[in-house]
Amino acid sequence: MVTPKLHLDLSLTKKMKDHIHEHDHMVQICGEVSSGETSLVGIKKTCGEAPCGFSDAKTSSIEAQERAASMRKLLIAVLLCAIFIVVEVVGGIKANSLAILTDAAHLLSDVAAFAISLFSLWASGWKANPQQSYGFFRIEILGALVSIQMIWLLAGILVYEAIVRLNNGSGEVEGSLMFAVSAVGLLVNIAMAILLGHDHGHGHGHSHDNGHGHSHDHGHGIAATEHHHDSGHDESQLSDVLIEQKKQRNVNIQGAYLHVLGDSIQSVGVMIGGAIIWYKPEWKILDLICTLVFSVIVLGTTIGMLRNILEVLMESTPREIDPTMLEKGVCEIEEVVAVHELHIWAITVGKLLLACHVKIRPEAEADMVLDKIIDYIKREHNISHVTIQIERQ
């Protein structure tokens, strides 16, 4: 005769096997079923994904190739910038031009931005672990904060020197050397713009969406845990996910490209100032005016970055997400009664997470409602990492 406890164990085992067949996940049962003891502690579940759910084994090869291509572009840009920074520093000192040194400081800010993007692409290949369950994306934020502080320090030194020279007068500025160095800088910026602007990335038609929601169904005083895994086999949804992943991977290249365009404009300004001073040396005050103007521009380029950093560190709701509209959209689902404990935050820029409690009608099927909610959040708000706790009314 089968005892009730043994019968319960066998039933649980059968349900787990059915769950394996349905969702194609790997489940290893380490504990032994005995008639004298029933335990679920020995059940070990292994999913083929990173703990944070940001990566997918089936697309890791494609992502690695595209990540390597982006890293090569950024590495070349960093090397070009680093070499020309040395040229500008030497040329600025010899020409006695603060404007060239300011351009070098701006270029240094670009090197910092490129290096952060490069490190971000490299670190995005690191796998999450139990200690760093969300991965290492926050390193990018910390690096950006350090680079901003360095840029502000350099800009402050240059502004101070420009003010001192305005008050006390400055030595002669060699307009010809100033023009030549800035002209070479413009050529370097054009080369980098061509490098970063020409995207060789190609789309691929296969992707697997591992986004998952976790629902905890609390009803009539009995707590049960349900895990929902969205396999995402619909081809149109796969295409949308792939396009969005492509945009996320290219955002570093696009940011670097915009930095280069800004540098090109500044190089043109220094060239014009150098040409005027070359033609009329007594107009050397233009060098100091260029220094003050471009220092303000350098500081201005860091404001947006600083705002993004503070929003991530304060775990503010990302600006591209309207939590009121999101909550309203979830509540418009027929089976949903209310939404509370809604939290939306970012691990780093572009990596969004959401957690909330959703109260549903007593007769509603939790899995079906969870499917609808996750589909809505991914489709309308592009949040791929969603954790939802289902509660009965």
Curated annotation (Swiss-Prot):
Name of the protein in its database record: Metal tolerance protein A2
Short name of any one Pfam family annotated for the protein: Cation_efflux
Role summary: Involved in sequestration of excess zinc in the cytoplasm into vacuoles to maintain zinc homeostasis.
Subcellular localization: Membrane
Gene name for this UniProt entry: MTPA2
Family: Belongs to the cation diffusion facilitator (CDF) transporter (TC 2.A.4) family. SLC30A subfamily.
Organism (species): Arabidopsis thaliana (Mouse-ear cress)
GO molecular function, a single term: monoatomic cation transmembrane transporter activity
Membrane topology: Multi-pass membrane protein
Family matches, as NCBIfam families: CDF
Compositionally skewed regions (Basic and acidic residues) per UniProt: 202-236
InterPro entries noted in UniProt: Cation_efflux, Cation_efflux_CTD_sf, Cation_efflux_TMD_sf, CDF/SLC30A
Vacuolar-side segments: 94-105, 160-176, 279-284
Residue intervals on the Cytoplasmic side: 1-72, 127-138, 198-257, 306-393
